[in-house]
Regions:
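Active-site lining segments of carbohydrate-active enzymes
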Residues: 1-59, 164-175
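Conserved structured core elements
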Residues: 10, 27, 31-38, 55-69, ...
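Short acidic-hydrophobic surface loop/beta-edge motif
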Residues: 18, 190-195, 222-224, 348, ...
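Carbohydrate-active enzyme catalytic cores, enriched for enzymes
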Residues: 23, 63-231, 285-288, 294, ...
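Long, repeat-rich segments with strong aromatic
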Residues: 34, 41-42, 47-49, 53-70, ...
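Active-site-adjacent bridging/hinge elements
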Residues: 35-48, 198-202, 303, 380-383
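CBM-like, beta-strand-rich accessory domains located in the C-terminal region of large
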Residues: 142-146, 151, 240-411
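Catalytic Cys-His active-site segments of thiol-dependent hydrolases/isopeptidases
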Residues: 232-237
Length: 411
């Protein structure tokens, strides 16, 4: 675990180092543990992309980075500040991930292994805000004890005693977070927001690769939030692990494979796992009115004769917000094609070409266009694997496609 670049590095280093500093009397022996923690904790930071993005999901960010914070506090206090794991420019970017990853109204994407409804631990942002001078007015005051976020024991214990955050002099607020978007260019993830979060559509769009920590095969996945409710998108999960999820059978689970994500299926073939399956960013153009984000997904689909498959997202902020998803397929010969939507809401057809998805308080409509107006069918399937039940809505053109565009307009 000392060589791992995921949350487990920080979790184990924190536990072992904390135990050593508490129980070992010999100062020289304790120093070995401190030196090892300082050295190997670098692997934890390597697990984040250079723009601060956490590929293993927000839940594991909470778990891993909160343990990193406690480890930092242990080393800082035991060395009188001579060792500071925050002495790295990348730490500030990682800390701001918890702010920048929000879509709107406290709703975050559940990309990778993450439960729907997970939010950032406020204590992480308060601790970093105080120690790094991030200038986040929202996290200027110490947050109340969390009841809606899974507790991390070591971080909870640290709050009971003076620490570098509680003893720090509060800095001035005033950091302005880009309200319109956050583009994690190293990770290939875009958060596009409406100017007004009340009753409007904002989105999260995912590229990256299929070899990430706590990976799902989800290139081209997206999340649509209206107001404070996720209506379409990545369903996250699992809520608990089956043993086979840690083996080469991981992607036999539909909710972890691309089948359980709002991404294409070509001739019945789902996405490949592994880093070779990569969403190459073909276009990233952003203005105050609209954001255009195009991903080349060709490498993810092992389909004979597939010359190209791109997914283009256009997010328009006019009105209440509109997301246009366009899949362009180019094959040597016609292939069956399927697009999918994932939802926890109710769905129904409104006319020949429109799907309505309704949540508890909000609803969106999805207008479908297929090549040559050949017609299409819409079917649904309930999926439940170690998590809440979700609905997969499949959209299939009535004939095979060799070249053309399947378009979804969501508003």
């Amino acid at each position: 675990w000392v060589h791992r670049t995921d949350n487990w590095n920080s979790v184990c280093l924190n536990g072992v180092t904390g135990a050593a500093l508490s129980l070992i009397e010999d100062v020289h022996e304790r120093a070995y543990y401190v030196a090892a923690a300082e050295y190997y904790s670098r692997n934890s930071i390597l697990g984040f992309t250079d723009d601060g993005y956490c590929t293993e999901g927000l839940g594991y960010f909470n778990y891993g980075f909160s343990n990193y914070i406690v480890l930092r506090e242990e080393l800082y206090q035991s060395t009188g500040g001579r060792i500071d794991l925050f002495d790295d420019d990348k730490i500030g970017k990682i800390a701001l991930y918890g702010v920048n990853f929000e879509i709107q109204n406290g709703v975050y994407p559940a990309f990778a292994d993450c439960k729907i409804g997970t939010g950032v631990m406020p204590y992480i942002l308060w601790y970093c805000n105080r120690n790094l001078g991030l200038g986040l007015e929202r996290y200027a005051a110490e947050p109340a004890w969390e009841t809606d976020v899974e507790p991390v024991l070591s971080a909870t214990a640290m709050r009971c005693f003076p620490n570098t955050a509680s003893c720090a002099v509060a800095g001035s607020a005033g950091r302005k977070v880009d309200r319109l978007r956050q583009y994690f260019d190293c990770a290939g993830v875009l958060i596009s927001r409406h100017r007004n979060p009340e009753g409007t559509v904002s989105v999260a769009l995912k590229g990256g690769n299929n070899g990430e920590n706590h990976n799902h095969n989800d290139l081209g996945s997206f999340v649509v939030v209206k107001g404070g409710e996720m209506l379409i998108g990545d369903a996250g999960g699992p809520y608990n692990y089956a043993g086979d999820m840690w083996t080469d059978k991981r992607y036999t689970f539909k909710t972890l494979s691309s089948y359980g994500h709002p991404v294409p299926c070509v001739d019945g073939v789902c996405q490949l796992p592994g880093a070779e399956a990569r969403a190459r960013v073909a276009r990233a153009d952003f203005t105050e009115e609209r954001d255009v984000f195009m991903l080349d997904l060709t490498s993810a689909y092992p389909v004979d004769g597939l010359r190209g498959l791109t997914r283009s997202f256009t997010y328009d902020r006019s009105g209440g917000g509109v997301l246009i998803v366009e899949d362009s397929i180019d094959c040597e010969w016609p292939r069956a094609y399927e697009s999918a939507l994932i939802t926890f809401g109710r769905w129904s057809m409104k006319g020949r070409d429109c799907i309505e998805i309704e949540g508890k308080n909000e609803r969106v409509r999805v207008r479908v266009t297929v090549p040559g107006d050949c017609g299409f069918s819409v079917t649904s399937e309930q999926l439940q694997e170690n998590g809440p039940e979700m609905t997969r809505i499949a959209i299939r053109p009535d004939r095979k496609i060799d070249r053309g565009v399947v378009r979804l307009v969501i508003e």
